[in-house]
Amino acid sequence: MKTVVVDFSNLDDLSGFGEIARNYAPRLAKVSDALPTLHFIFIVPERHKGEFGCHIDYVSREHLKSDIKPYAHQIDLWHATHQQFKYRMHGKGIHQLLTVHDLNYLHEKHGIHLLKHKLKMPLMIRRSDTVIVISEYVKHDVEAHIPLLNKELQVIYNGISDVEQQEQRKPAFAGDTDKFFLCIGQVREKKNLHTLIPMMKYFPQHKLFICGANHWSYADTLRALIAPADRERILLTGKIADDEKCWLYAHAEALLFPSRLEGFGIPVLEAMRFGTKVFSSRYSCLPEVCACHASYWDSYAPEAMAQVVKEGLASWSRDGAEAEAARTYSRTFNYDRYTEQYVSLYHKLTADSR
């Protein structure tokens, strides 16, 4: 039997890494009971130890270095599920698997902070035996900027949860009869949200809800762009609960996603599950992930953006053929497939170990 360590340190995080951990951990635990050749050790926050069954071993994120020592000579494979991991054990016979989600630091960091990442990421990849990326876009980014030393990159797309089957709850900021557009994600400069605010003058009967963590200074930049008369119409709501998110997807006229930097772009696929029209930028991975199931902005002039939205909505019905095609497409990105692909990879990588 081979022993595989999987890092689920981010289980409690309200982030993309946390979302993946909360979906992947229970599915992997469920299928692992029927995998006689693999034994799993999950790295989890202390309070989650034992949560996924007694057939799994657990080490706590808080005491990782000490808790993992008794297993040191048993480990065949260590899966760092993202590039921001805090620790991984290196040793003879331990195959290092790394999943890379993006190289956004190339576009976001400057000066000494950029230099730090430019030094750290190649070292991280050099010390990995196998590297997985979450989109073709990320694959091309890594190949263009990091020496791979003959490593072949493999793409395993993220899954998304079955949000359309989850409970819904109307947020307090949403009225019963509001017509609104939705934007979901961290309120950061890379999300390009400032382009939406002048566009909204062409939709005086609509509200715009920008939902997500907004403690960065960019949120203040957006607030300054919102005219006093529009402050009840264009809202930075802050973080929202999952049931609120599902209600908003189900009732929004459209999801607006002008982001410049995405490793994957989960909200566009989640919106499709509800038959909600998606408007997207053509930047980074978004054309790859949305494919033909979104309308795209080629200009960020407010009137041109508004025209794309008006034309897209005019031919869209939540119950129409285009919406159903988008739903079907979105369902191909699921965590059952994601789990199956990683389990297959674990089998392959441990076949010749030790």
Which residues fall in each region the model found?
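Carbohydrate transferase catalytic cores enriched for Leloir-type hexosyltransferases
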Residues: M1-R354
